Structure formats: C-alpha cells, structure tokens
Regions:
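C-terminal/domain-terminus segments
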Residues: 224-250
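A polyanion-binding, active-site-adjacent surface
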Residues: 2-165, 169-183, 211, 219-224
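Short flexible/disordered coil segments
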Residues: 108-115, 177-202, 234-239
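Short, flexible loop segments at boundaries between secondary-structure elements
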Residues: 185-227
C-alpha cells in the first residue's frame, strides 16, 4: 500500500462525510432521509468488517446501503465500531443480527475466504454512503446512488480491485453508472443476466487496468428468495454464481 493511497482515501472519507448533514434524534420524524453517522471513520460502516487498511484489496464487495445505525437492533455492531475507533480489539460480527452478513460468510467460502477473520484482500462498502434515519430496507431511491457514484468511482480507483462484486440489481446498475458504462439494452430479467455470458462487465480503472463487475443476487432473505424464483431461501444458486468468480482471481 502506497502513501498516496492512504492520503487519497482519507481525503475521500472527509469529503463524503461533509456531503451529508449530521443526524440528531429529532431527524427521525423527517421522513426517510440520509445522514452521516459520526462514529464512522471509514468510507462506510461495512468497511469495519473487511477493509480497514486494505487499500490494495483484490476483491471489492458492494452493497446498496448500510441501513440505519441508530436502530436499536444494530447497537451491538455500533459498539464494535466504537471499539475499533479506539484501536481496541473488536469483532464486527459480535451479536450481529444481519441475515445478509450471515449468508456472505457461506458465499465467500466459495472463493476461499473465511470472512469471520480479517482478510487483507477484501474491501467491503455500500454504493450509497449515507445512512437512513429510520428503517433498514425499503424506500430505496436511485437519486441516492447518483449522489455517491462519483465517490464510489474514486474509491475503486484508489483500491484498484480485480473484481467488484455487486449485491442486487440496483447496486450493479449504480456501479456501471459510476464507470459511465452505457448498455445497449435494459436488463429485463436480472436472474437471467446473472447466468448469462454478459456477466461480468469489464470496466477500466483510472490506472488503465481492467476490473470485472459482477452482477450477483442480494443475499438477504428477499434477494435470496428472488434468486430462487420465489421457491426457497437456500443458497445453492448463489453458491454456483459465486463459483464463477474464481476464474477471474489470481
């Protein structure tokens, strides 16, 4: 990792933080809006799981948005974040209630990673870098991704990953937009696209290298159900999708 990467990353975090208003308890009655979470000292709260200091990671995992860090259910996770900020030993997954995160543990095993431990080759973030003032899902707005796509592109150019793994259609389309990829036709069936030879999509990083952007199903309960045609919530199809990523890794 080079010092210019550290400087560029720190500068990016500052600018993203400044682009969002600060949250106060009164904001919960404002309707669904995004704010900055002041305890987040990384680009995203997900980065505390995998990504702190990993600015040469080969694999970037990208979700839609983190959700609401003020939600009571996620206070154990936030306590771990605060420990990390104090350079204390921490475990992002300690009492973590997220089914998405639990399924990711199984999916990353297909790539040979045990993500219950620190993995210097991984960097986790969400495309939308602000935080909901209430609720954990639903009500997603494409304008949120438009606001942050330039920041995401900067982040990818800093890290220079080989593969960018996108959880869900909105995330995949947002990442392609960040790289100004113009598709000739709209994706009509996301499951079919995941399985097609058009996946992954090659994009060019600022350094001229190619990164491969993978369309993947979201691995939360609803995304998994959709990937299985509403028939089950098992991970077999997603495990098969993830196996295809291996060919693009060293």
């Amino acid at each position: 990792m080079h010092i210019n990467k550290e400087h560029a990353y720190s500068n990016l975090v500052i600018r993203v933080r400044q682009s969002y208003p600060s949250y106060s308890e009164s904001k919960i009655d404002d309707g669904l809006r995004l704010y900055w979470f002041n305890d987040c000292e990384e680009i995203n709260l997900w980065t505390y799981w995998q990504g702190r200091g990993n600015l040469d990671a080969q694999i970037m995992l990208v979700g839609q948005d983190w959700g609401c860090p003020w939600d009571p259910n996620y206070q154990p996770t936030i306590e771990q974040v605060r420990k990390a900020n104090q350079n204390d030993e921490y475990d992002y997954l300690n009492n973590n209630p997220s089914p998405t995160d639990a399924n990711l543990i199984a999916l990353f095993k297909e790539l040979g990673y045990i993500i219950t431990e620190p993995c210097p080759n991984l960097f986790f973030t969400n495309l939308v870098l602000g935080y909901r003032n209430k609720g954990l899902s639903g009500g997603y707005r494409k304008a949120w991704a438009r606001q942050d796509k330039g920041y995401f592109k900067e982040l990818a150019d800093i890290i220079e990953p080989t593969v960018i793994l996108c959880l869900g259609r909105s995330t995949f389309e947002g990442v392609l937009s960040a790289f100004d990829v113009k598709r000739s036709s709209r994706i009509k069936n996301y499951n079919a696209f995941i399985e097609s030879t058009n996946n992954p999509v090659a994009v060019t990083l600022e350094n001229g290298k190619t990164a491969y952007v993978f369309a993947l199903a979201h691995c939360g309960a609803m995304g998994t159900l959709n990937r299985n045609g509403k028939k089950s919530t098992d991970l077999e199809k997603q495990l098969a999708d993830w196996r295809k990523i291996r060919a693009y890794l060293d």
